Amino acid sequence: MLKKNVETFMGCDADYKDAKIVLFGAPFDSTTSFRPGTRFASAAIRRESYGLELYSPYQDRELSEFSVFDSGDLELCFGDTKTALSNIEKRAKTILTDGKLPFLIGGEHLVTLGSVRAAVKKY
């Protein structure tokens, strides 16, 4: 079972066992082509999420009604792309195996590949 993050996305407070969605950060930017810094995105997204409107006109409900668990950021080694993608894939696989939906925040675009690999193997 994953541990709860202290600073959560939009203040989500579900327990892991009850959550349908599990958020995790992948702070990685080793292959960016212009300016590094996307590794700080997951922390910035969480910090700014407290100011978001909770009502979704698309869902016609409060986003706080969704059962979300924030498992925090992975510790990813700068410069080791292969290991970073493997770690992201492992986290996504754990979440999928537990019957939950992974919600990845990054990081550069490449971090998506790890989660996609896990989903392809499952489905």
Predicted regions and their residues:
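Metal-dependent C-N hydrolase catalytic cores
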Residues: 1-123
